[in-house]
Swiss-Prot record:
Localization (cell): Cytoplasmic vesicle membrane
Encoding gene per record: Gbp7
Effects seen without this gene: Mice show a dramatic susceptibility to T.gondii infection, resulting in rapid death of infected mice in the acute phase of infection. A significantly increased parasite load seen in the spleen, liver and the peritoneal fluid, with markedly elevated production of pro-inflammatory cytokines and development of severe ascites.
Annotated protein name in UniProt: Guanylate-binding protein 7
Species annotation: Mus musculus
Domain annotation GB1/RHD3-type G: ranges: 35-277
């Protein structure tokens, strides 16, 4: 089990003491360490029907979940056992054993209903365990399924607006398996041999008639058929005919159990291992251990506060928590990759921006992988701002590294020049020419220094600015120059200074243009990955709707075949409405891009510092500065 302990024994997940449910923090801590998707198998049934034995077999053990040896129900609340999946190494198998339903020692029968509802909400495969046969009495005992509409909400509504949204259950309910223990009948129907699945489906056929008695008898049948489209049945012979041995069945060697029971148990386990899927919420949200922990806590908190557990609220809680973590993961990835791939100072700004673009693309992908239900792209916008701030910090670090490196190199290269000035080497006739030659050599040597970075021209320009007064002093004292020559030299110096300043401004303009282009790439990358994610989500919704439609059409067909024409016709409106929703969803594809551009695009421009109009304003200011410099140069020439 990746990122989690291999549990040697079960722990209580939801405690049920004095008719109050409480989440066990120890179990939550175990779940929070499981990063793999979880296949959750929950078993529910009347007390003392051998549920725990089946769960122990799934765990590959004889012992673990408490079987008990008396008529008292041993399992209280919901117990959990997390084990490595025996055939899917990338998944963790989470087994949930629930306390027996219908225990006479319980006071409030609602307690059983909540346990039943929690088992449905948490599992990807729901096993209902009963004894002997699936008859009228067995279906009556499964009345808990008829109460699910009062115990579970798919969508968030206020109490005054509560509506029956059980139509949505099919999109997130688990697969349903009915296990019949100590099966006493032959699998035959009207003289022909049938499968256990056919036996179940025959038992779920509606009883003809519209009497109150028939409607009451049909209610659990209809609920199972409507809520659980994927159904399976397993029947088991008695493990042993020896009543005394039966009490201690967990201690019996497997080869001493009835052969048929051994085969049936292996078939059951094999089916679970091969066919049980990872726990998935609506729209394809796959649940790992950490998410399961949040779901358990959210549902139990809702029950204890007097509310009905709501899937939409639970998903919102999950999204708020995980999307914040997704932003942090993505931002950390960006920082780590930038630090690994860059050597400061970079030779050019473009070198840094190229690395930034690659790292940002990866960071956005990390966010998309770990986020879901990001309403209005709130968290993606946070990531955009965070990455922009980190990029600005790297730009500052790059500038500081370049400044420090260039200043150190220039100080070293100009040391001889400074010493010559101090010693008065240039205070002789022809000294101005000697000074210019010495300074030119410093500039040429500086030019050959590798990887000076983005502040190379700035440092050189500052150095040359510091030499203006020194050059003028040397020139004025040079007796080899006439007044006319001095005037010409002064004009040349001014022209060179203006050209250097112009060159610096051109560099700034070029760098600003590069930053703008990087912002545009950032915008396009965010939109592209968002579009891809939204398209995937749209397809998931469409797939769920099509599964729901297929399920409704099957129910309608079965109703018609069973002679319930009125019920069949009543479904026409539901089916028609669902078909319209599917068509609308298909048409959304063409407008998806425009929606992203209109919504998220505008926000990106406003939340990213220095983008959009700010870049345009910066370009105008720089352009104005360049024009002013050029005009000043023209005035000097005149």
């Amino acid at each position: 089990m990746a990122s989690g302990p291999n549990m040697e024994a079960p722990v209580c997940l939801v405690e049920n003491e004095n008719e109050e449910l409480r989440v066990n923090s120890k179990a939550i801590n175990i779940l929070e360490r499981i990063t793999q998707p979880v296949v959750v198998v929950a078993i529910v049934g009347l007390y003392r029907t051998g549920k725990s034995y089946l769960m122990n077999r799934l765990a590959g053990q004889n012992h673990g979940f408490n079987l008990g040896t008396t008529v008292r129900s041993e399992t209280k609340g919901i117990w959990m056992w997390c084990v490595p999946h025996p055939s899917k190494p990338k998944f963790t198998l989470v087994l949930l054993d629930t306390e027996g339903l219908g225990d006479v020692e319980k006071g409030d029968p609602k307690n059983d209903s909540w346990i039943f509802a929690l088992a449905v909400l948490l599992s990807s495969t729901f096993v209902y365990n009963s004894m002997s046969t699936i008859n009228h009495q067995a279906l009556e005992q499964l009345h808990y399924v008829t109460e699910l509409t009062e115990r579970i909400r798919a969508k968030s509504t206020s109490r005054s607006e509560e509506v029956d949204d059980s139509d949505e259950f099919v999109s997130f309910f688990p697969d349903f398996i009915w296990t019949v223990r100590d099966f006493v009948l032959e699998l035959k129907l009207e003289g022909r041999v049938i499968t256990a699945d056919e036996y179940l489906e025959n038992a779920l056929k509606l009883i003809p008639g519209m009497s109150i008695k028939a409607q009451k008898a049909n209610l659990p049948r209809e609920c199972i058929r409507h809520f659980f489209p994927r159904r399976k049945c397993f029947v088991f012979d008695r493990p042993t005919k020896d009543k005394e041995l039966l009490v201690h069945v967990e201690e019996m060697p497997e080869d001493q159990l009835d052969h048929s029971f051994q085969v049936q148990s292996k078939e059951f386990c094999s089916y679970i291992f091969s066919n049980s899927k990872a726990k998935t919420l609506k729209e394809g949200i796959v649940v790992n251990g950490n998410r399961l922990a949040t779901l358990v806590t959210t549902y139990v908190d809702a029950i204890n506060s007097g509310d009905v557990p709501c899937l939409e609220n639970a998903v919102t809680t999950l999204a708020q928590r995980e999307n914040s973590i997704a932003v942090q993961k993505a931002a950390d990835h960006y920082s780590e990759q930038m630090a690994q791939r860059m050597r400061l100072p970079t030779d050019t700004l473009q070198e840094l921006l190229t690395v930034h673009t690659a790292c940002e693309k990866e960071a956005i992908a990390v966010f998309m992988e770990h986020s879901f239900k990001d309403e209005n792209q709130q968290f993606q916008k946070n990531l955009v701002v965070t990455i922009e701030e980190k990029k600005e910090d790297f730009l500052r670090q790059n500038e500081a590294a370049s400044l420090s490196h260039c200043q150190a190199e220039l100080d070293k290269l100009s040391e001889s020049l400074r010493e010559s000035i101090s010693r008065g080497v240039f205070s002789v006739p022809g000294g101005h020419r000697l000074y210019l030659e010495a300074r030119k050599k410093v500039e040429q040597d500086y030019e050959r220094v590798p990887r000076k970075g983005v502040k190379a021209n700035h440092v050189l320009q500052s150095f040359l600015q510091s030499q203006i007064s020194i050059e003028d002093s040397i020139m004025q004292s040079d007796k080899a120059l006439t007044d006319g020559q001095k005037a010409m030299e002064a004009e040349r110096a001014q022209k060179e200074a203006a050209e250097k300043e112009q060159e610096l401004l051109r560099q700034k303009q070029k760098e600003l243009q590069q930053v703008m282009e990087a912002q545009e790439r950032s915008y396009k990358e965010n939109v592209a990955q968002l579009h891809e994610k939204m398209e995937t989500e749209r397809k998931n919704i469409l797939r769920e709707q099509e599964v729901k439609l297929e399920h409704k059409l099957k129910i309608q067909k079965d109703m018609l075949n069973e002679g319930f024409k009125r019920k069949c016709e009543a479904m026409d409106l539901e089916i028609s409405q669902l078909q319209k929703e599917i068509q609308l969803n298909k048409e959304k594809n063409s407008s998806l891009g425009a929606k992203i551009l209109d919504g998220f695009g505008d926000v990106l421009i406003s939340v990213v510092p220095g983008s959009g109009k700010y870049f345009g304003l910066g370009l105008k200011i720089l352009s104005s500065q360049m024009n002013q410099t050029q005009n000043s140069d023209k005035v000097r020439k005149l």
